[in-house]
Amino acid sequence: SGVSGDERRVGLLIASFIKPHCDKLFFDRTGNLIAFKKGRSTPKSPVMFCAHLDEVGFMIRHINDDGSLLFEQAGMMPEVLLSKRVLIGENKIPGVICSKPVHLTRGKEKEPPQTDNMYIDIGAQNAKQAKNLDVYAKYAAFDNAFTVLGDGTAVCSKAIDDRFGCQVMIRLLSSVPEYDSYFVFTVGEELGGTGALAAVRYIKPGIAVILESTTASDLPQNTGGNKVCSVGGGAVVPFMDGGTKYDERLVKRLWDIAEENGIRVQTKSRIA
């Protein structure tokens, strides 16, 4: 696991895979893992490929007298958290996210709870037991099994955002790029993209290609433009996202490359 702020182990694992394929490999002060690979030619400014190491998760901020844990989270909607299993700290202490039982709620309490009204139950009977498990100020990640769905073309897992992007970059590093390229495995994306900002300032790329997951809403109740994009419909090359308008020439070039190589692509019909 590599929750935002605790990505180092994931970075070290990836570094062990890609080291034989890099001309230069290092961690910057932000925590980004940066790989440089010499291409067939050297442009005025290098190309940068980018995918983030971190996943959504939690940090334990307080231990209650009864041994339950309060937490902070980033990058998630609170209503999806209840009943989720988590693993806390280096010792992977198991816990479950809980709130007041719905059959005991009254009035506004029946509304979806916010994280301030949730806690993690680790089975401790009191604060002393919880402290002995070394969970205070530790990171917590979801405890989900990697599951293959259907005919094997779909999977269910935590951290798909953005370990799939990391895997694509690992594969790219096994070949020689057309141009001198940096491959940046960034930290802090779920906290606002702090790692990516630091990498751009250091590398000063002419072109940056971000390999990310995105929103698909191809559900039975959604039709046409409300689907955003479809799982299995090909790689998504959007024209814009929230806060970002992509260079039209670069978008067109990516679409042309896809057509020339028989690669299925789609765009997003909504900014989501």
Question: Model regions: which residues?
Answer:
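N-terminal hydrophobic/helix-forming segments and targeting peptides
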Residues: 2-272
